[in-house]
Amino acid sequence: MRGFTRTVYALFGVLGVALGLLALVKPELALRPGDANGLTTHLLREEGALGVFLGLMAFWCFTHFEERRPVHFALLVFAALFSLIHWREYLLDNRSIGSPLANSVPLLLLAVTAPYKPLPR
């Protein structure tokens, strides 16, 4: 399980940093043509900065495996909130089912790999 967990951290780290940097540099790539304006690009850049931070936290968990518990649970809470936002939008008929399903994958991976028991000292 340790190898799988470290793979999850590495994947989240690479995706978070890479996609976050892309959103910082080219936020209009995430928008439909004509939807880019000052507010939408600003919000996407902020989300990109958050993605970089989350990716760096995943890398920290990868490199500090024995001490990762509080950071892992913080990532788990974030993933739960992010997933709930998308499920709410789906239930209000504002999104297709693909959106909440895709946004539940990180939550499930973090839940499966969570260090529920503290490591012995």
Regions found by a protein language model. Give the residues of each.
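Core segments of alpha-helical transmembrane spans in multipass integral membrane proteins
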Residues: 18-19, 40-62, 77-81
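Short juxtamembrane and helix-loop transition motifs at transmembrane-helix boundaries
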Residues: 30-40, 60-69, 91
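Non-cytosolic membrane-interface motifs at loop->transmembrane helix junctions
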Residues: 34-41, 94-105
